[in-house]
Amino acid sequence: MQLKTVEGDVAKLAARGEAPTAGLSDFLVRDTPVAYAFIGPAFFLLLFLVAYPFVLSLWFSLSDARVGETGSFVGLDNFARLLRSGIFLQTLQNSIVFTAAALTLKTVLGMILALLLFRLVRFKRLIRGAVLLPFIVPTALSTLVWWWMFEPLYSVVNWTLKSLHIVNYDIPWLPDPYLAMFTVILVNTWRGLPFFAITLLAGLVAIPRELYEAAESDGAGPIGRFWHVTVPLLKPVLAVVILFSAIFTLADFNIVYVLTKGGPFNMTHLFATYSFVLGLQSGQIGQGAAVSLFLFPILLAVVFVQLRMVRKAAMYD
Amino acid sequence: MARVSRRQFLRVTAGGAAGALALGRAPAVAQTRELTFLSIASFVPETDKELKRQFEEWGAKNKVKVRLDIIAHLQLQTKKAAEVQARSGHDLTALGPGLGDADLYFDYLADLNDVATDVAPKNGGWLSQSDYLIRGKWKLLPWWQPPFPMAVRTDLLEKLGEKSPDTWEDWLRVGKKGKAMGHPFGTAMGHSGDANVTLLSILWSYGGSYVGKDGKTITINSKETRQAMDFVKRLYTEAMDPEVLAWDDASNNRCLNAGKCIAIHNPISAYESAKKDKVVVPGTQKEIAEVIDHIHTPRGPADRKATTGFWCVGIWNFSKNVDLAKDFLRYHFQPENLNKWVEAGHGFNMPFLTNLTRHPVYKSDKQYRFIPEVAKVTVPPSWPGPNTAASQQVWDLYIIPDMFAQHATGKMTADQAIAWAEKEMQEIYAGRKRKP
């Protein structure tokens, strides 16, 4: 069996690396004021839309701000208070379980899907496009459809299972805390899978075919080729995808808000949903900000380590 | 047509904009007065149509441009917070559920003492004035409440040989029998407003409460609470389906109208929609509205009490039209306008004014006969404590439903669940102490 590589795609990617446009770019690079002018808008956008809200939320988390009040500095009081709250500790646990499970599923299934898409010969474009659908449809909308499918009274999933005589009772998808967690993980995985699959596919396409041929002539089987050629060469892509997805998954709001509102008894609350309830619905902006910033130091460390890994892997190339 | 070049256009518009900015107000042409009102979508949509009609009528009389924005009730909390944070938005706003907003947004709501005093005598006085005064002031007008009777299936009760269940224990018995024939009892126990309402009603009916009159002491740890929790555990395991843990505010309506539930603790909205949509009992040609009846909210061993969403209306003090807004409130709260509005809402929207609880609509259909009775035993959600931002947070975080659910599902013992709720509530009340 031979893994196919789409040579055309590789050639195109390689071609994109060069592309000399000497005259104009030389002028622009040398002209420092012009460069600043071009960077300016993006810089100000970042400053006002990212840096300012971030610093503000940092301040909120260290203050006793409520809706309408700027509040005064209280140090780490909000964080201490959160650690005393049963709901928050539950939220912390949920977030870790949710992110770990969803990421694992997305990585494994995403890899499988990418390998399948890679080997696809007929209707390639159509199928690759269709795979992206869950990622494109607005989450609030698609999750609502999932809610209809799992809704306790009219669940079409239960109806189907019962009609096929697989079960003879209604499975409490959303009322049972563990099944509810399973359901939100399932929907998150469904939504995030295309991102993994398509990005990994791009990585696969970029792996030179000669490496597989060399491995094959050295006697490596399909599994050996996967572990010793595909995985190492995909590592940088994989690291970036997992990094991005970890951040997005941890910050998920829509899926939980639409499906469970954090219930039953807070067993599916995530940082974003709990922060929303605490900060906006109850007006405790300081504490709400503390919830959403709680993982910031940990995330920062993860980003640091992963980016280092990526850089190392790139150098290895 | 004279052609305007791009340059001319830019010069004129930029000049105009600069002028407007310098003056700090819009040019005279645009200076029509405008009053804006943020409200929530009613479960009986005719209510909103009548409100809009009155608002427009008032606007036409006073030469004021009016704009009524109606949003889903779940969006209101975030919208209010955003408007206060930005100190801008609508002039008039719906507030609630609960009177806690008056405390939470105390510094941002205009005083309504004059309006409250004006409108009360014309309508027979406020139902329970002391409940609505927050820190001794009228910061909002209590607007409407949907009282929570028991909505029941008379045909199923007849089948079971049950005459008139009146206590919570009666409903456990009925629910058990109903569940055995595929028609369980239904009350939400998850993160929804209905769960708060019904479980608080049960807690009080068994003699329990969560906060004392002083608004400080957490009183949840009591033998009455334990009794209420044991009752709810039996109700959940013996008379209901586990799906109630994931119900939202519309689920019990669906359960009744789908012909599944034997009874739900809910306002008349389920019946209203069944009637409007001509829903039939599954497998028959019979309209389900014909076999629905509404009876009194159940009694417990200690009391008969219930609560509901106390929907209110207020005026932001950062509004530039406080006086105009007050004028509209006076207009809307005139007896004839309130009467029309209650009529339009088929009584779902009962005002907190004595005369309106005796509105003819409650006699027009035998379905509504218990609604004024239920209103008499309806108390604010923080009862017997005052309405505060803290009590609002207990409601928003669903502490009461979660306490009951954690015990009912066997996740915690009664003592553990109570200890959990007590600690959460103590933290909430301690964290909400007002700055001196």
Question: What does each model-found stretch correspond to?
Answer:
Chain A
Residues 1-39, 122-124, 307-317:
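Transmembrane alpha-helical segments of polytopic membrane transport and secretion proteins
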Residues 34-317:
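A structural signal for multi-pass alpha-helical bundles of membrane permease subunits
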